[in-house]
């Protein structure tokens, strides 16, 4: 059994915001597996299914982003799993929209959901799939803003959603690669730099 967690904020007002890319990725996996992420368990909405020949529990924490670690720890404990059984999908400002990166471990790099998980689990050694949302139009004093609104929590425009859609497909393939080939092989496959077209 593997625990696959997407990070985001609960509530319809956050549904299609950049910060909810992790939730959207879980929804995409659920769609492919023909399940609904609706069972409440471990402070999250969950669905048990099979993906790439593996038993998995899909989860979307209901704790809000900054407390995601509480939900992840509760689920790992309930399922009697370790951090090696965890895959987390989340948004990443430092990665261009339409791309993803797979990592075996790493720092939070300012992401409060990741910081919460690492803090509660006491380690940064867990697999993550970072979904690129691109840089915000303006960054000042650590607050990411776009036209006076918080970029991360503002609904995405149609073109941005189209590009994010490509990232979500890649994220699903990356999860399948981690499950079937391992993290190293998934990193080799998905972390290659794309050469610009001439």
State what each model feature region is.
Residues 1-108, 114-130, 135-150, 154, ...:
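Nucleotide and nucleotide-moiety/phosphate-recognizing core
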């Amino acid at each position: 059994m593997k625990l696959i967690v997407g990070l985001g904020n609960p509530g319809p007002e956050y549904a299609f915001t950049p910060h909810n890319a992790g939730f959207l990725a879980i929804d995409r996996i659920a769609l492919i597996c023909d399940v609904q992420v609706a069972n409440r368990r471990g402070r999250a909405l969950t669905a048990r299914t099979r993906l790439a020949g593996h038993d998995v529990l899909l989860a979307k924490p209901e704790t809000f982003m900054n407390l995601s670690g509480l939900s992840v720890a509760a689920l790992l404990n309930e399922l009697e799993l370790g951090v090696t059984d965890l895959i987390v999908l989340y948004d990443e400002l430092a990665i261009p929209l339409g791309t993803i990166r797979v990592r075996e471990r790493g720092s939070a790099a300012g992401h409060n959901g990741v910081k919460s998980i690492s803090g509660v689990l006491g380690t940064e050694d867990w697999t993550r799939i970072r979904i690129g949302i691109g840089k915000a139009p303006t960054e000042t004093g650590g607050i990411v803003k776009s036209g006076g609104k918080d970029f991360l929590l503002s609904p995405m425009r149609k073109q941005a959603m189209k590009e994010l859609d490509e990232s979500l497909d890649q994220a699903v393939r990356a999860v399948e690669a981690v499950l079937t080939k391992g993290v190293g092989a998934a990193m080799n496959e998905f972390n290659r730099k794309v050469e610009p077209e001439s």
